[in-house]
Design a protein with these regions (language model features):
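Regulatory cytosolic signal-relay segments
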Residues: 1-23
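Acidic loop->beta-strand submotif enriched in PP2C/PPM serine/threonine phosphatases
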Residues: 20-35, 131-172
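Primarily the active-site beta-strand->alpha-helix module of PP2C/PPM metal-dependent phosphatases
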Residues: 26-81, 160, 171-187
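Conserved beta-strand-loop-short alpha-helix elements that form
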Residues: 36-48, 112-113, 151-175, 229, ...
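Catalytic core of PPM/PP2C metal-dependent serine/threonine phosphatase domains
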Residues: 55-124, 146, 199-229
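His/Asp/Glu-rich metal-coordinating catalytic cores
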Residues: 100, 105-110, 115-120, 127-158, ...
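Short active-site oxyanion
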Residues: 107, 259-264
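C-terminal catalytic subdomain
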Residues: 167-255, 259-261, 281-395
Length: 395
C-alpha cells in the first residue's frame, strides 16, 4: 500500500508532427474525487492531423469514462475498437491507448493496446513488473492483444507513457537506424533522474519530447507525446485573501500564516496590512509595473508573494482557464500567483468574509463583488484541470 502523504503529479508534453497544426495524440486525466482515484489516458490516432485527432479523442474519452466506471480491461478495449469510425482510405479503424488507473489505496492498474510499453522507475532504476497478455476472441477483433499489469507504487516512483513518435524518433539516422527505442528512452530517463532525483513530471516529460525532436533533426516524423506520473512528497501552498469577519480574529489569521509550512501568498492590501501589524513586520512595496492592468507586488519577511486582491485574483481565473502547455507566463502579479499554484500540490485557501465596501460599486463587474466566488472558481479550475488537492476555509 502506498504511504500516506504521497502526491500524484501528472503531466503530459506533446509536439506535433513537422508541418502539422493539429496533434493526432490525445492525453486526458481526471481525478475521481469521491473515490480518491486518478485516471490517465494517452491515445494515438491512426495517421496524422484532424482524422488522427478525432480517432484519438474518441478513444481517450471512452477509455477514461469506462475506466472510471471500473469496467474490465477486455470490455473497455472491445467497446472502443467496435465504436471507432472506419477510415475511408484504409478501410479500417485504429487507435492505440494506454490507461492508468491509480486507486486511493495505492494500487496502480495499467491497460495498453499497441502503445510503447509503459516504463516504471523506482528512483533511478527501472522496475520490472509482470505483464499479462489478453488475446481478444470476438469475431471483429480476434487475435488482437491487450497488455495489463498491476503494482503497488512507492514514494519517488515514476511511470512514463508515450506514443511511438517518441520511441521511433531518429529512425533511419546514423545514431538510431531502428529508432530511439525502449532501450534508448530508458537510458535517457535514468540519466535525467540520476542528475536530478526530484525532477518534476512536467520537466521530465518535456525533456523526453525535446530529445525525440532532436533525434528527428528537429523535423518530427510523427506526433510525439510523453506523459509522466510521479509519486512524491506534496508541495504545500497557502493563499490568504480578505480580512476576517471579526476583527478579534486578526491575530488568528496572522498566526495561521506564520505557522504554515510551505509557500505563502497574501492577496489584498487590507489583509496584508493586518498580518504585518499582528506579526510586527514591515511591508515593502515595489514600484515596478510588469502588468499595466494590476498594481505591483509587495514583499514581507516570511511571505513569498503579496498582491492586490480581487482584480489580481480575477485575472488568475482567466489565466488558469486559458492555460495550456504553450502559454508562457509573464512577470505580472497574476502570472506569479499562477506559477506558484502550478508548482504546488496541496493548496489551502483562507478567505476572509468581511465585506470590502470598495467592491460594492455597481459599475464593477459582478464577479468582483464577492471574493468567495472568485476563489471558488480558482479552486474548481485547480481541481478539475490541474488535479490539485484544494481546501477552502472561511474566517
Amino acid at each position: 500500500m502506498m504511504q500516506p502523504g504521497v502526491f500524484v503529479e501528472v503531466n503530459c508534453q506533446q509536439k506535433n508532427r513537422s508541418g502539422q497544426r493539429i496533434c493526432g495524440d490525445v492525453f486526458l486525466s481526471r481525478k475521481v474525487k469521491e473515490e480518491g482515484r486518478v485516471v490517465v489516458v494517452l491515445s494515438d490516432g491512426m495517421g496524422h492531423g484532424v482524422k488522427a485527432n478525432v480517432l484519438a479523442t474518441l478513444t481517450a474519452t471512452m477509455a477514461l469514462n469506462f475506466a472510471r466506471e471500473h469496467k474490465q480491461a477486455e470490455r473497455i478495449a472491445e467497446i472502443i475498437m467496435n465504436t471507432l469510425p472506419v477510415c475511408s482510405e484504409r478501410k479500417m479503424s485504429y487507435s492505440t491507448f494506454t490507461v492508468i488507473d491509480i486507486e486511493t489505496g495505492g494500487r496502480v492498474t495499467i491497460l495498453q493496446y499497441d502503445n510503447p510499453r509503459t516504463l516504471i522507475f523506482r528512483g533511478n532504476k527501472p522496475l520490472q513488473v509482470p505483464w499479462n497478455c489478453i488475446v481478444m476472441n470476438s469475431e471483429k477483433n480476434r487475435g488482437k492483444e491487450i497488455h495489463t499489469c498491476t503494482f503497488e507504487p512507492q514514494k519517488e516512483d515514476r511511470m512514463v507513457i508515450c506514443t511511438d513518435g517518441i520511441t521511433q524518433s531518429g529512425m533511419g539516422s546514423p545514431s538510431y537506424p531502428f529508432g530511439w527505442g525502449e532501450e534508448g528512452l530508458t537510458g535517457f530517463i535514468i540519466d535525467q533522474i540520476s542528475q536530478n532525483p526530484v525532477i518534476s513530471a512536467r520537466r521530465l516529460a518535456s525533456r523526453v519530447v525535446t530529445m525525440a525532436n532532436k533525434n528527428d533533426q528537429y523535423l518530427l516524423k510523427d506526433d510525439a507525446s510523453c506523459a509522466v506520473v510521479y509519486f512524491r512528497e506534496p508541495r504545500r501552498l497557502l493563499l490568504v485573501t480578505g480580512p476576517p469577519f471579526e476583527k478579534e480574529k486578526d491575530a488568528v489569521l496572522a498566526k495561521m500564516v506564520d505557522g504554515f509550512e510551505g509557500r505563502k501568498i497574501i492577496c489584498g492590501g487590507t489583509t496584508s496590512d493586518i498580518i504585518a501589524r499582528e506579526l510586527g513586520r514591515e511591508i515593502k512595496d515595489s514600484f515596478e509595473f510588469p502588468d499595466p492592468e494590476l498594481p505591483p507586488v509587495s514583499s514581507m519577511e516570511g511571505v513569498d508573494l503579496i498582491t492586490e486582491g480581487i482584480l489580481t485574483l480575477s485575472k488568475v481565473v482567466r489565466i488558469l482557464h486559458d492555460y495550456n502547455n504553450n502559454i508562457v507566463l509573464g512577470k505580472g502579479p497574476a502570472d506569479q500567483i499562477v506559477r506558484l499554484l502550478r508548482e504546488s500540490d496541496e493548496i489551502h485557501f483562507v478567505i476572509g468574509t468581511r465585506i470590502n465596501e470598495a467592491h460594492q460599486d455597481p459599475n464593477l463587474p459582478v464577479e468582483l463583488e464577492i471574493r468567495r466566488t472568485v476563489v471558488k472558481r480558482i479552486a474548481r479550475l485547480l481541481e478539475e484541470k490541474f488535479l490539485k488537492e484544494v481546501s477552502l476555509s472561511f474566517i
